[in-house]
Amino acid sequence: MSASTSSHRPIKGILKNKSSSGSSVATSGQQSGGTIQDVKRKKSQKWDESSILAAHRATYRDYDLMKANEPGTSYMSVQDNGEDSVRDVEGEDSVRGVEGKEATDASDHSCEVDEQESSEAYMRKILLHKQEKKRQFEMRRRLHYNEELNIKLARQLMWKELQSEDNENEETPQGTNEEKTAAEESEEAPLTGGLQTQSCDP
């Protein structure tokens, strides 16, 4: 039976082995009263950090050890009212500029004003670019939804055209080919012109 217990390895847990920490506690416990040290040992736990990492984190999961060395980016959200947001940005920048001007010397004043003007111009440029992108997106979205309506109208017009051709074929089955082609050309011209004007409307 001793052979089976010696070949059987104990399961490695998160906590430190009792034998490694228990032996040091036992020797000190024998010196200064074993009951006090046993109580402290029962109340406190010592964690084996390497066992925790090995048990709960695979080797390929080192994403929590990576560090970002990039500086934070300044982001300004665009509000619904484009003109109001431009005014708000100008107001905030001017307030920040006034506080900065009071804190600096007269020699630094000219450098700071240049930097502030360039940063204000840059922020305005970014804001205008974002507003332009938003406007273009909304225009494309409107055109996309109008495209569905245009397709429905085109289907209705095609259906009406087919119905009118069927009615004409039933009424005059013996008509000449020249009359049909002239009639079809006159009908097609207004229909295609109508589709073109409808697709251009926003």
Curated annotation (Swiss-Prot):
The Basic and acidic residues compositionally biased stretches are 84-112
Keywords per UniProt: Protein phosphatase inhibitor
Q: List, in alphabetical order, the GO biological process terms annotated in this UniProt record.
A: intracellular signal transduction; regulation of signal transduction
User: Residue ranges under compositional bias (Low complexity)?
Assistant: 19-35
Tissue specificity is: Detected in sperm (at protein level).
Keyword Oxidoreductase in annotation:
no
**Required for binding PPP1CC catalytic center, displacing metal ions and inhibition of PPP1CC catalytic activity: annotated segments:** 144-147
Give the start-end ranges of region Required for binding PPP1CC.
Answer: 12-17, 43-55
Give the Pfam families listed for this entry.
IPP-2 (PF04979)
Could you tell me which InterPro entries the record lists for this protein? PPI-2
GO MF term set: protein phosphatase inhibitor activity
Q: Polar residues: which segments have biased composition?
A: 71-80
**UniProt region (Disordered), positions on chain:** 1-51, 71-118, 162-202
Q: Family, per the entry?
A: Belongs to the protein phosphatase inhibitor 2 family.
Q: What does this protein do?
A: Functions as a protein phosphatase inhibitor. It inhibits activity of the catalytic subunit of PP1 and weakly inhibits the activity of myosin-associated phosphates.
- Could you identify this protein by its name? Protein phosphatase inhibitor 2 family member C
Organism placement in taxonomy: Eukaryota, Metazoa, Chordata, Craniata, Vertebrata
Q: Which gene encodes it?
A: PPP1R2C
